[in-house]
């Protein structure tokens, strides 16, 4: 206990202040309102008054009043207003300088908030505060203050020298580099979860499961059996009495997803005759991912949709085979050739017309032989190419966009044309014989000059 004041009036005023203080504290305790910071500010103003020589607040109260209890760090008295509230800035586990929502002014209100936050954080051990780590993704990055804001805030009401303590090197905060990297990542399009521990990994520009397949059968860096059956699809063009199913291989599905068509989930589901459902596209993508094929959502088709797009390769080849059979057996090549030959009965034109028919027949044969050497993969077959890569790539493009129907169909049509040319040449030979017979009967036989010229020209 300190010695009592000399002045009697000072003693009475001091006791009056003590009684008022304890009455207010007693009422606050009964009301359940914590008022530590407000009481401390009043005590600070009293201690700095003209009666600063009064003894500290260690007076023993009467039995009606309980001594006040101040939780740490306010327990050691007296309270000094000049205490540095920013001494914890260099603490890497403190979030106070980084989580102040206001930039300025740094007034009395912020000093009280800093004191209240420090009172709730300092008594706790650092091991119990894992959420304060700078590497934790649950931090509120949107309210984090940047270093430039901290540096500029030194000019708004801070004490002398306080700006130096808030510099980037003085903070030493392990989360500042993380905040910078997170903001840069957000600007570049990568998203991070703010309120979850799980982070989203940025998707590379080229997916690992690329749709292009090399010659060794490796798809997207992984070995895929392209001859494996993916599903069986009922035919679209068959009648009810002769419905057949066609096996769709993994290689065929890969060809539908690759250029030139690049089908999306909706069109691929139509090709595979999958029923429309709410989650049909997602289930199809999940099934394709199991075999190493990637079908991104929201994909746009690259080629125009035709009737051939809806056919699987087995049915398209079946259609081309039936078309070729009909062209071979049912095309009226003889009737067409006879009709056209009757329009060219001039004996002077027979020789030139026959030469044109022979040249056309030779050109069709060359073109048919080229198409017959096409080695585009169809179904589960992967024949070795025999043509040059330049021409083979063009034939492959045509075959892929027609699902294997194009080249066989053209060959079938050329077969019908070849049959017509053959019948036309036979008709031309008959016309030559008829003309020769007519010349013999008219005195223009082989012994005559005209007959000798025609015979020599025919040879």
Swiss-Prot record:
Expression triggers: During retinoic acid-mediated differentiation. Up-regulated by starvation and a high fat diet.
Domain of life: Eukaryota
Keyword tags: Activator, DNA-binding, Isopeptide bond, Nucleus, Phosphoprotein, Transcription, Transcription regulation, Ubl conjugation
Low complexity bias: start-end ranges: 121-132
Expressed in which tissues: Localizes to neurons in areas of the cerebral cortex, cerebellum and hypothalamus (at protein level).
GO biological process terms held by the UniProt record: aorta morphogenesis; collecting duct development; distal tubule development; ductus arteriosus closure; fat cell differentiation; forelimb morphogenesis; gene expression; glucose metabolic process
Family the UniProt entry places it in: Belongs to the AP-2 family.
Task of the protein: Sequence-specific DNA-binding protein that interacts with inducible viral and cellular enhancer elements to regulate transcription of selected genes. AP-2 factors bind to the consensus sequence 5'-GCCNNNGGC-3' and activate genes involved in a large spectrum of important biological functions including proper eye, face, body wall, limb and neural tube development. They also suppress a number of genes including MCAM/MUC18, C/EBP alpha and MYC. AP-2-beta appears to be required for normal face and limb development and for proper terminal differentiation and function of renal tubular epithelia.
Protein name: Transcription factor AP-2-beta
């Amino acid at each position: 206990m300190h010695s009592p004041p000399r002045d009697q009036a000072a003693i009475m005023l001091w006791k009056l202040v003590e009684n008022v203080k304890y009455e207010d504290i007693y009422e606050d305790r009964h009301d359940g309102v914590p008022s530590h910071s407000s009481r401390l500010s009043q005590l600070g103003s009293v201690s700095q008054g003209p009666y600063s020589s009064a003894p500290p607040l260690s007076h023993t109260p009467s039995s009606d009043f309980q001594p006040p209890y101040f939780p740490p760090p306010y327990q050691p008295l007296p309270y000094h207003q000049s205490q540095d509230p920013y001494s914890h800035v260099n603490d890497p586990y403190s979030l106070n300088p980084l989580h102040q929502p206001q930039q300025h002014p740094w007034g009395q209100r912020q000093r009280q908030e800093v004191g209240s936050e420090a009172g709730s954080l300092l008594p706790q051990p650092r091991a119990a505060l894992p959420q304060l780590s700078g590497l934790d993704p649950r931090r509120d990055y949107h309210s984090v203050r940047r270093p430039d804001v901290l540096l500029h805030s030194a000019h708004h009401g801070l004490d002398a020298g306080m700006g130096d303590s808030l510099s980037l090197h003085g903070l030493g905060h392990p989360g500042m580099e993380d905040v910078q990297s997170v903001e840069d990542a957000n600007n570049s399009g990568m998203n991070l979860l703010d309120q979850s521990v799980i982070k989203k990994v940025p998707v590379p520009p080229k997916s690992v499961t690329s749709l292009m397949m090399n010659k060794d059968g490796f798809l997207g860096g992984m070995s895929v059996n392209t001859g494996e059956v993916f599903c069986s699809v009922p035919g679209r063009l068959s009648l009810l009495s002769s419905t057949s199913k066609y096996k769709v291989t993994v290689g065929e599905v890969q060809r539908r997803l690759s250029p030139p068509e690049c089908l999306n989930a909706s069109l691929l589901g139509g090709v595979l005759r999958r029923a429309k459902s709410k989650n049909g596209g997602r289930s199809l993508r999940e099934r394709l991912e199991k075999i190493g094929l990637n079908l991104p959502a929201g994909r746009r088709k690259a080629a125009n949709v035709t009737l051939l797009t809806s056919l699987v390769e087995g049915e398209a080849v079946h259609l081309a085979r039936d078309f070729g059979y009909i062209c071979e057996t049912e095309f009226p090549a003889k009737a067409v050739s006879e009709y056209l030959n009757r329009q060219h009965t001039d004996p002077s034109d027979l020789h030139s017309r026959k030469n044109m028919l022979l040249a056309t027949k030779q050109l069709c044969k060359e073109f048919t032989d080229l198409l017959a050497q096409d080695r585009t993969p169809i179904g589960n077959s992967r024949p070795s190419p025999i043509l040059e890569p330049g021409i083979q790539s063009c034939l492959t493009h045509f075959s892929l966009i027609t699902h294997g129907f194009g080249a066989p169909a053209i060959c079938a049509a050329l077969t019908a044309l070849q049959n017509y040319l053959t019948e036309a040449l036979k008709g031309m030979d008959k016309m030559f014989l008829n003309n020769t017979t007519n010349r013999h009967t008219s005195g223009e036989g082989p012994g005559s000059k005209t007959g000798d010229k025609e015979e020599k020209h025919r040879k």
